[in-house]
Every structure is written in C-alpha cells, then in structure tokens.
C-alpha cells in the first residue's frame, strides 16, 4: 500500500504529530513549525489523498486513521485541526497506547447539526459536495473563506490558506467528497467519553464551522478534557494567533 507524505523536524523529547483539515495539506503549519520544532520532534503529515499523499481514493475515517498510524512514532501527542481532529480522535479511540495526549483544534466530534446539537447544516455540506463536481476550485476557495470570516486578520489568513492549497496539486474530487462525507456523518461524542489521556480542545470564538455553543456542551460530556477559546480567532487559530497557540502546546508538554 502507498505511504503518505511525512516530514519530521526538530529534536524535542516529545513527538507531536500535526494533522491538517479538509482540502489542505501540511504546508498549513509552516506559520508555526519553526517555533514548535524547538520544543518537540514535529511530524508534518499530508493526509491520504491530500497534498503529496497521492494514490488514495476516498477513505472512511477508520481507514484514514490506520493509514496515518502506519508511519507514526510509537507514542506522540496527536493534534488534529478540523477534519484532522476527527482522525486524531479516531486514533486515540482505537490505539490509546500510541497517544500521549489528544489535541483537537477548531474541531467537533460531530460537525453536522443534529437535534439539540449545533453544527453545519447537512444541506450545506451536501451543497458543497454537489458544487465540487460543478466548480471544483471555487468551491474549495469558498470553504476556505468561511474558515477565516470575522477575524481582524481575515483577509491575510484567507490568503495564507489559499496559498497552502495552491502550493500543491489539488486533491481528487472523490477524495474531497470522501472528506465531506466524514464531516457529514461521523459522530464521536459518546465514544470520546471513554478516552483517558490528557485531552485539550481549542476553539475560535468567531468560528463559523464549529459553533462556540458546543464548548460548554462538551465540557459537560467530557469532564476529563480541557477547553480553551481564542477570543478573536475563527476556524484557524494557529494562523491568526500563533504565539498564543504555541504557548498552549508547550504548557501541555509539561503535563504529559
């Protein structure tokens, strides 16, 4: 089976694996990788089918997690942003012995709105799937614009995300559709009640994709976890608030 693209940098005594979000690739971490690699051995990954990890079709969440795990260090802090947060969470559920701590960034265990659960309306996700077939690049760009909307640095943050996407060949439409299908259908709210490793959840107050209303709901559902909200961030707090983001991860390292 194909290997995925994987880059390791830094010599820290704790491994930190970074998993990107839908439509993107590991270049999205370049705004913080230098700082982080002075504290961690950093692992930058292109998820299967994204960026330089070619030769994969659409995968289920479970299969995506298994592919990523094949090349991973024995034990690491796993950090996942958005869709990557679901992949990191799946690894924490199925291989807890490999996970020193779980960090989710602007991620929800259930992205899709359900009864009494705030999220993205299913018809919005279905609409993105339909539009992918019609106008592939414009749909991805619209999704990226949603991620930074409302922040003081929205334009430059959106430019940074767009640059990341355009730096490498676009994923295949079926891979993008598969990722949207995961966002539309997966619900890890109850399974994640059972994880016992340190669990840090990071959110943006202005996030239009993961509503801040989920934060107190998950605080109650997962009392063993910790949450932090970036007051002026949207869906990409590591781009808009890199220093604050870095400090939170270094503080977590002291506790594992």
Swiss-Prot record:
Start and end residues of each AB hydrolase-1 domain: 15-242
Q: Which residues form the active site?
A: 82 (nucleophile), 207, 235
Would I find Hydrolase among this entry's keywords? yes
For the ligand (substrate), the binding residues are 22, 82-83, 143-147, 235
Q: What class of enzyme is it?
A: hydrolase
MF (Gene Ontology)? pimelyl-[acyl-carrier protein] methyl ester esterase activity
Q: Please verify whether the record's keywords include Ribosomal protein.
A: no
EC no. given is 3.1.1.85
As its record notes, the protein acts as a catalyst of: 6-carboxyhexanoyl-[ACP] methyl ester + H2O = 6-carboxyhexanoyl-[ACP] + methanol + H(+)
Query: Which keywords appear in this protein's UniProt record, sorted alphabetically?
Result: Biotin biosynthesis, Cytoplasm, Hydrolase, Serine esterase
Where does the record place it? Cytoplasm
Provide one Gene Ontology cellular component.
cytoplasm
Gene3D superfamilies of this UniProt entry?
A: alpha/beta hydrolase (3.40.50.1820)
Tell me, what does this protein do in biology? The physiological role of BioH is to remove the methyl group introduced by BioC when the pimeloyl moiety is complete. It allows to synthesize pimeloyl-ACP via the fatty acid synthetic pathway through the hydrolysis of the ester bonds of pimeloyl-ACP esters.
Q: Provide the family line.
A: Belongs to the AB hydrolase superfamily. Carboxylesterase BioH family.
Query: What protein is this chain from?
Result: Pimeloyl-[acyl-carrier protein] methyl ester esterase
Q: Which organism is it from?
A: Escherichia coli O6:K15:H31 (strain 536 / UPEC)
């Amino acid at each position: 089976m194909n290997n995925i693209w994987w880059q390791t940098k830094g010599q820290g005594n704790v491994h930190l694996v970074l998993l990107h979000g839908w439509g993107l690739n590991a270049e999205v971490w370049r705004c913080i990788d230098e700082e982080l690699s002075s504290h961690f051995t950093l692992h930058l990954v292109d998820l299967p089918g994204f960026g330089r990890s070619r030769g994969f079709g659409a995968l289920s969440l479970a299969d995506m997690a298994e592919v990523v795990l094949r090349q991973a260090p024995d034990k690491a802090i796993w950090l996942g942003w958005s869709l990557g947060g679901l992949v990191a969470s799946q690894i924490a559920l199925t291989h807890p012995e490999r996970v020193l701590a779980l960090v989710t960034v602007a991620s929800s265990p259930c992205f899709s709105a359900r009864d009494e659960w705030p999220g993205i309306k299913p018809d919005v996700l279905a609409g993105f799937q339909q539009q992918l077939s019609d106008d592939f690049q414009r749909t991805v760009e619209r999704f990226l614009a949603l991620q930074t909307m409302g922040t003081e640095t929205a334009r430059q943050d959106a430019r940074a995300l767009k640059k990341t996407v355009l730096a490498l060949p676009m994923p295949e439409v079926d891979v993008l559709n598969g990722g949207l299908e995961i966002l539309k259908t997966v619900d890890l709210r109850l399974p994640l009640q059972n994880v016992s490793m340190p669990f840090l959840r990071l959110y943006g107050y202005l996030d239009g994709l993961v509503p801040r209303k989920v934060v107190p709901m998950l605080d109650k559902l997962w009392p063993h976890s910790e949450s932090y909200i970036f007051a002026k961030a949207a869906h990409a707090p590591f781009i808009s608030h890199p220093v604050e983001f870095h400090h939170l991860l270094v503080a977590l390292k002291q506790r594992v």
